Amino acid sequence: MHWSERRERFRSVIEGDRCVHPGSVFDPISARIAEELGFEVGMFAGSVASQTVLGAPDLIVLSLSEFADQAYRICRAGNLALLVDADHGYGNALNVRRTVEELETAGVAALTIEDTELPQSYGTVGGTRLISIEEGVGKMKAALDGRQDPSLVIAGRTSAMDITGPEDTVARIKAYEAVGVDAVFLSGVTNTDQLAVVSDAVNIPIFLGGAASALGDLDALSAAGVRICLQGHQPFQAAVKATYNTLKALRDGTPPSEITTTAPKDMMKRLTREDDHRKWMQDWLGGELAERD
């Protein structure tokens, strides 16, 4: 796989002059759908990974290898430039370096490393705490050192705006910019004053973990230096509901022929690359793929 090309495409997005919404993806099929629909960037979140791979909530119980394996499955399925949420880097600065190595090998175009104290330690359940700026800087340095392909984008992430306020947020993102991260990712920015403080503080692209309506439309976000703005992870949630409703209908006695919300055959053939597989069968096995229901 030629991962560098999609990383360069991701860089062209964040070095451009407009903000985009990434398509939230969770497996090979969803990634192909996002690519087919024209999303410039895909997003694979840690919370969605935990739900998809383990059926567990976002409590940092997913391992690095489990996350990297699923990221690789997504990357190899198509040509979508994938941004992944690498949480806290699965440990200290040494673990962060290893995390970058594994995710780069998996083919991701960009990743975020955050300065939240994770996983939650004994006696701190119910609250969110941040590591020190000094430890955060160490993690960012380790992430950058672990990168082999210079086109891989590394973003320093913080939730400080929602925890310790604007002043600490600025101190953190300026410190991360100073050591060389390519972008900063912020959660908890809810109004234009907060966004202006952030925008004035750094000269690198800004990613937002969701934008409140008070922040304005894509044009307003673009003008403030935001280049990636998440919209949530509705595709996986919708898939869960659709699966639940379909199974319930079948369990309740609805004949399969009356289930009308399934993907049509031509869509499934397209998304599973059936034509490619038919050609390979002809070229290499001397036969054709039989039609199946």
What function would you assign to each model-found segment?
Residues 250-293:
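Flexible C-terminal active-site loop/helix
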Residues 2-248, 282-293:
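Alpha/beta enzyme core
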